[in-house]
Amino acid sequence: MSLENFGNFLTLDEKHSFIKKYFKEFYTKDFKLFTSKDKHYRTRAELSFYHENDTLFYAMFDPKSKKKYIIEYLDFADEKICAFMPKLLEYLRQDDKLKEKLFGVEFLTTKQELSLTLLYHKNIEDIKSNLENLSNNLHINLIARSKGKKLIFKTENLRQTLNIQGREIFYEFNNDCFIQPNTTINEKMITWVCEILSIQKRMDLLELYCGYGNFTLALAQFFFKVLATEISKSSINFALKNCKLNNTTNIHFARLSSEELSLAIKKEREFFRLKDIRLDDFNFSHVLVDPPRAGLDKSVIDLIKKYENIIYISCNPITLKENLKELSLTHRVENFALFDQFVNTPHLECGVFLSKV
């Protein structure tokens, strides 16, 4: 979440100075700072298309003024995206059917692969052969979308390998999954959590908002058992697949919202989706939360504050502070890390480790 409402903080030092003051009621020790390379760090990019004089341009539009900016190069985007952008644009400009009513493009990369999604205001079934030719001629994993329709050429799934403390963790996911869009920072975040856990007394882990298992797979080795929850069915399916890719057998996934999990743990409601999981068999020493920008609601806070240790990954310092007001009644902040996920922008990712008072 942006800090621009508080000032024009762009460098990590500027963000650090602000955060030190902003969270001083909860934490006065040293913050751990994690930097990113300042170019080609972002693995996801979304652009509009602008049509003029029967040709096509990449564009961005200011959300407030609606002013148009023609885009020729994205210095923050992964090198694979930058290399592919001109090839795609040249191909589209030469195919009238492909460029007609084309309004957007999404790029997604991993260390190994690249996928492309084209967005249309027309029935993509009518240009299926053109799309297939594009995929074949440019050797690209292609997804095309229009209202109520989706076509896939080659595959929509991407493979990723993260290096965590000398270990390789293998993942598969697609464009519909929530991903950390800066791979270097993602590896540093996971490693930071692993380093804290390595010196802790540990039993079982409860993880909320687990997605496709980004943290889960790397942290599982530190615990006897892991219960990880997520509401997205496709993300759960990828998480199960990623367990097999890593030969990990101590993780139990449940497709539940955090509110549903709270009801289940308090035995206020039974869920068929938990029929193969006995909650009483878990002894949670740690809970990990990586919530959306809105942060944690009261039911989740009431749930997690029962546990000895909390790891909170936050993309929004504002809601993090609000949540810490509640959590600080039972826990204290032991470690605080700042991750410069989006370099030279007011955005900041935080990691907080809390233990029971």
From Swiss-Prot:
Function noted in UniProt: Dual-specificity methyltransferase that catalyzes the formation of 5-methyluridine at position 54 (m5U54) in all tRNAs, and that of position 341 (m5U341) in tmRNA (transfer-mRNA).
GO cellular component: cytosol
Catalysed reaction, written as an equation: uridine(54) in tRNA + S-adenosyl-L-methionine = 5-methyluridine(54) in tRNA + S-adenosyl-L-homocysteine + H(+); uridine(341) in tmRNA + S-adenosyl-L-methionine = 5-methyluridine(341) in tmRNA + S-adenosyl-L-homocysteine + H(+)
Gene this chain is encoded by: trmA
UniProt protein name: tRNA/tmRNA (uracil-C(5))-methyltransferase
Enzyme class, broadest EC rank: transferase
Record PANTHER family: TRNA/TMRNA (URACIL-C(5))-METHYLTRANSFERASE, TRNA_TMRNA (URACIL-C(5))-METHYLTRANSFERASE
UniProt-listed Enzyme Commission number(s): 2.1.1.-, 2.1.1.35
InterPro entries to which the protein is assigned, alphabetical: MeTrfase_TrmA_AS (IPR030390), SAM-dependent_MTases_sf (IPR029063), TrmA_MeTrfase (IPR011869), U5_MeTrfase_fam (IPR010280)
Keywords: Methyltransferase, S-adenosyl-L-methionine, Transferase, tRNA processing
Protein family membership: Belongs to the class I-like SAM-binding methyltransferase superfamily. RNA M5U methyltransferase family. TrmA subfamily.
Binding site for S-adenosyl-L-methionine: Q180, Y209, N214, E230, D290
Superkingdom, natural source: Bacteria
Biological process according to GO: methylation; tRNA processing
GO molecular function, one term: tRNA (uracil(54)-C5)-methyltransferase activity, S-adenosyl methionine-dependent
Active site: C315, E349
Organism: Campylobacter jejuni subsp. doylei (strain ATCC BAA-1458 / RM4099 / 269.97)
